[in-house]
């Protein structure tokens, strides 16, 4: 069963399709070649119509990232993933002295053509081509794309009142703030300093009429009469950042937009970023990257609906525990070591300007409550959005699949929650030919009657890589075709499997293969997730067959083939009708918290009901993990 959660607003792999003038374009403008660093070399990306300047000592990957050329680098440029493939068309380069041995670009590409950008430094001006599968996508705001979605509950914490104030005269020269208080009797009005700074100008520009933005008894902003009152909901994911613009006066979803999380420059997974955050200035770099992304999203969304960021009077954000900590500037060193304790877990409200968000001067940011460990506000938001699905069943399981996969088992009112460090492999990260869902990406893989692989390619173009929705399909097809055995070892005797330098790879198409290392990466990811499911069931004294409703959330989860998930052992063998794929539930949940104060209370209650389970402390963890590494031939999807 596939059920689209309202307000998802995303395309494949959680990204709206098409070009955009957003974060990347603005970064391009700010970092044009006219700001050349003395002694630096120019890097020309002709196919992107970009010319940038490489700083002395930077690798090509670092220079590209620093200047807004979004090259995929799942390992953060450490040289271990092989995803930042480039071709130096002209110019001289050298191998960086800090280059680490690592995975080379995917088999099937001429090794002298495609190289790792993170391992090269420019010795002259260069012309560089980025491999299609190594280009991070740009996206376009989806304006009113969720008109058919279920309406949001509407009871916002911020209300806007259009009103008039008695003009000041020589006989009544009372201060502007006092005049406003007179116009709002009984409010015990408190004025935010940012709002007070704007008040004199707005009053006189509007001939003593204005729109007062009130949060309870606090004036958080002023604007001209008739100005929109907007809210911004943000799903701060490890891989992508999605934002939704809501009209707080009628609850309409006005626009949505998603971009790659720029923190990916420091690693695709949470632990890599936690490790970077403990380095000097590392945490501030990551925090600033998140703030820059949110500000860019706010700017582009408002521009799409003829508004300005100052019209955003309330913000709600959800993310996993580490993402929320990094956004708030909270320490994360303690998250990277047992017992993985958060600095704070309750939902909190902070002034947007304290974080550096360019919205209404006195607006607040509501950060969703967390559960514990790495089960953060994004999972609480997903539980909030799906509660009508799981509350009606005796036993339900909610799984939000991503780089960090969160799982909650709900049984007779109890909620057991855990997180699994599944990594980016299932989304196409750390896969030799992995790429985002764009033209040329293989999105579906099947098996023909003659045992050959069948491919469905986005845009019906020649295949250039494999995106997340096809990864599980490949694994299931390789196993069914006999190209991979029950342990995941590729069969060197199969004609579609090649062996090069002792490494095996299954050929999917010209220049696109699935290597033995790719198989192992998927095995580790799917075993981590399945182990989490089984251990939570064991903790509750249940069997997988007891799950009446299996809810799969997340942009990736919306596009996987449930049959492939079962055949590979990622998902338990259940009738297909018990599964519900709901898309970006975290995104819907944070929209609900933005639009309605009662939903924030509901989220806090859900978080309080959850009992966090640290899987690694449970007896049998290692045994269960090893048990699910392989591919059980008895696991077959059933109707």
Can you say where each PLM-predicted feature lies in the sequence?
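Catalytic phosphate/nucleotide-handling subdomain of diverse soluble enzymes
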Residues: 411, 542-606
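Fe-S ferredoxin-like electron-transfer domains
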Residues: 31-34, 97-230
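Acidic, glycine/GT-rich loop-and beta-edge segments that sit at the periphery of enzyme/chaperone cores
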Residues: 39, 114, 129, 133-168, ...
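Conserved phosphate-binding catalytic cores of ATP/NTP-utilizing and phosphoryl-transfer enzymes
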Residues: 205-230, 362-396
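Immediate flanking context of iron-sulfur cluster ligation sites
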Residues: 58-82, 89-117
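Glycine-rich phosphate-binding loop of actin/hexokinase-like ATP-binding domains
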Residues: 236-238, 243-271, 334-349, 381, ...
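N-terminal phosphate-binding loop and adjacent alpha-helix
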Residues: 262-303, 430, 442-446, 521-524, ...
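Phosphate/ATP-binding catalytic cores across multiple sugar-kinase/actin-like superfamilies
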Residues: 293-305, 379-386, 523-545
């Amino acid at each position: 069963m596939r059920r689209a959660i309202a307000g998802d607003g995303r395309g494949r792999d959680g990204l709206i399709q098409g070009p955009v003038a957003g974060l990347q374009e603005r970064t391009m403008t700010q970092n044009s070649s006219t700001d050349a660093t003395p002694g630096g070399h120019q890097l020309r990306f002709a196919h992107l119509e970009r010319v940038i300047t490489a700083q002395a000592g930077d690798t090509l990957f670092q220079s590209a990232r620093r200047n807004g050329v979004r090259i995929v680098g799942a390992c953060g440029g450490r040289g271990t993933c092989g995803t930042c493939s480039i071709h130096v068309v002209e110019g001289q380069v050298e191998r960086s002295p800090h280059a680490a041995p690592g995975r080379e670009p995917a088999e099937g590409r001429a090794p002298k053509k495609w190289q790792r950008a993170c391992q090269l430094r420019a010795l002259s001006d260069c012309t560089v081509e980025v491999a299609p599968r190594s280009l991070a996508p740009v996206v376009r705001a989806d304006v009113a794309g969720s008109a058919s979605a279920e309406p949001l509950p509407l009871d916002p914490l911020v209300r806007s009142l259009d009103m008039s104030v008695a003009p000041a005269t020589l006989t009544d020269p009372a201060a502007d703030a006092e005049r406003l208080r007179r116009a709002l009797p009984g409010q015990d009005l408190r004025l935010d300093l940012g709002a007070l700074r704007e008040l004199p100008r707005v009053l006189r520009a509007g001939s003593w009429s204005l729109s007062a933005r009130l949060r309870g008894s606090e004036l958080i902003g002023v604007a001209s009469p008739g100005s929109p009152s907007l809210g911004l909901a943000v799903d701060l994911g490890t891989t992508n950042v999605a934002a939704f613009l809501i009209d707080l006066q009628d609850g309409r979803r006005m626009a949505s937009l998603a971009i790659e999380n720029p923190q990916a420059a420091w690693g695709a997974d949470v632990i890599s970023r936690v490790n970077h955050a403990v380095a000097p200035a590392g945490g501030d770099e990551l925090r600033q990257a998140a703030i820059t992304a949110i500000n860019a999203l706010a700017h582009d969304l408002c521009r799409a609906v003829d508004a300005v960021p100052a019209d955003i009077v309330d913000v709600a954000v959800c993310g996993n525990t580490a993402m929320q900590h990094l956004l708030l500037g909270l320490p994360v060193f303690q998250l990277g070591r047992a017992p993985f304790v958060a600095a704070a877990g309750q939902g909190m409200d902070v002034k947007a300007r304290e974080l550096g968000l360019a919205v209404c001067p006195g607006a607040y940011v509501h950060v969703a409550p967390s559960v514990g460990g790495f089960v953060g506000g994004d999972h609480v938001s997903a539980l909030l959005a799906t509660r009508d699905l799981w509350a009606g069943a005796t036993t339900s399981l909610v799984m939000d699949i991503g780089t960090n996969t969160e799982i909650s088992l709900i049984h007779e009112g109890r909620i057991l929650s855990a997180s699994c460090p599944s990594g980016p492999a299932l989304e196409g990260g750390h896969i030799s030919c992995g790429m985002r869902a764009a033209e040329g990406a293989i999105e579906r893989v099947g098996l023909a009657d003659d045992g050959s692989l069948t491919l469905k390619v986005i845009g019906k173009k020649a295949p250039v890589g494999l995106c997340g929705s096809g990864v599980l399909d490949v694994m299931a097809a390789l196993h069914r075709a006999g190209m991979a055995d029950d342990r995941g070892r590729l069969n060197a005797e199969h004609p579609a499997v090649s062996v090069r330098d002792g490494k095996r790879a299954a050929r999917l198409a010209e220049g696109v293969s699935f290597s033995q290392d790719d198989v192992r990466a998927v095995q580790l990811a799917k075993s981590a997730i399945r182990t989490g499911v089984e251990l939570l069931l064991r903790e509750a004294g249940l069997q997988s067959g007891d799950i009446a409703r299996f809810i799969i959330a997340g942009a990736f989860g919306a596009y996987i083939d449930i049959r492939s998930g079962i055949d590979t052992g990622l998902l338990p063998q259940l009738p297909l009708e018990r599964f519900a794929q709901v898309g970006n539930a975290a995104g819907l949940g944070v929209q609900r918290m933005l639009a309605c104060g009662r939903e924030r209370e509901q989220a806090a209650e859900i978080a309080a009901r959850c009992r966090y389970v640290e899987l690694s402390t449970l007896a049998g963890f290692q045994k269960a993990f090893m048990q699910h590494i392989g591919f059980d031939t008895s696991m077959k999807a059933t109707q």
